[in-house]
Amino acid sequence: MNRRTFLAAGAVSAIGCAAFRRGTGAREAVARPARFPNVLLRTHEGRTVRFYDDLIRGRIVTVNFMYARCQNICPGMTSNLAMVQRALGKRVGRDIFMYSITLKPEEDTPAVLRSYAAAHGVKPGWLFLTGEPDDVETLRRRLGFVDPDPAVDADTSQHIGVVLYGNDALDRWAACPALSDPDEIAKYILWMEGRRRPA
């Protein structure tokens, strides 16, 4: 386990997940929509989208960062999130949407991301995203995927292995290590609907 995975794991509760909601007195993980930059991105399917308007607004979503040539945490994270996608079944792409954003947009073209997604058995409803480097960096920082140590933060190979998930319509957001038990991650994503509580 690298330092970032350890920090992420230590920052969340015993089951590996932590929720934040506006107005509860808890630290706000992400506010809407001001903290969601509406930058242009390209999907692994070749479409151009706006981050907030097209991907986040009114939806239940997951967001994580990765890059295709990563040999550290990324392959395990992607494989684990593929199990989350399977656990959520046909809801992914219908009313739950998954997004993985490359940390190396200068390398990860839509074609590269398409190959990466195919190699990991990614199904419809999960988009891999690239864009202009400055826009991707803005997203990373505004979404909170930042290490407090500037030297560590500058090292892409030590990026934070966390998945952010939430419901924009309810302004309910949480995060957990992307290597948490996939069934637990799926359960807490479903909790974001507001009609249920975790068992």
Which residues make up each language-model segment?
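N-terminal export signals
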Residues: T5-R21
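N-proximal helix/coil linker or "cap" segments that precede and/or mark the start of modular domains
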Residues: C17-N38
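A short beta-strand-turn-helix
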Residues: L40-I60
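Thiol-based oxidoreductase modules, predominantly thioredoxin-like and allied folds used
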Residues: D95-E107, G125-D134
